[in-house]
Amino acid sequence: ENVDYCESLAAKEYFSYYHEGFNRRSEDPINSRLNYGYAVVRSAIARKLVATGFHPTFGIHHDNQLNAFNLADDLIEPYRAIVDLVAHNNIASNIQLTKSERRELAHVLHNACIGDGVKVNVMSAIDIMVESLKRIILDASTEKLKLPMILPIESMEGITE
């Protein structure tokens, strides 16, 4: 069965729970928040990939020649849920995000999750995941990729912005 087709069917089903008639490409306040939050996490993953020596264009599953971030798109999936949780807080009625909303969504990188069995922020979980991918590839390891476990929305202590 075509993996892309399965992924698109799953996404369609998932997004149908947002509200009736929701389309992930529609222009509405929820979608604006989701897109911004996903972009924040995607760019953090891409930065870590480059810093670790990966070329983010070369993906494992994603392989669009016009996409410079295929590998980041492969790795973002487990982080979408945390963006979804944050994006559904205080939804405004305007498509255009305010500075405050953008700050709140960028703060997703400081939310708590479990990375390698320890409570860490999303940025640290991204570091753990990418470093584990590097070890798997370089050592031809059978180790599993260290993915985050999502927690309810909670900011790590000591981070105010």
Name these PLM-found stretches.
Residues E1-E161:
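Active-site helix-to-loop segments that bind/position phosphate- or nucleotide-bearing substrates
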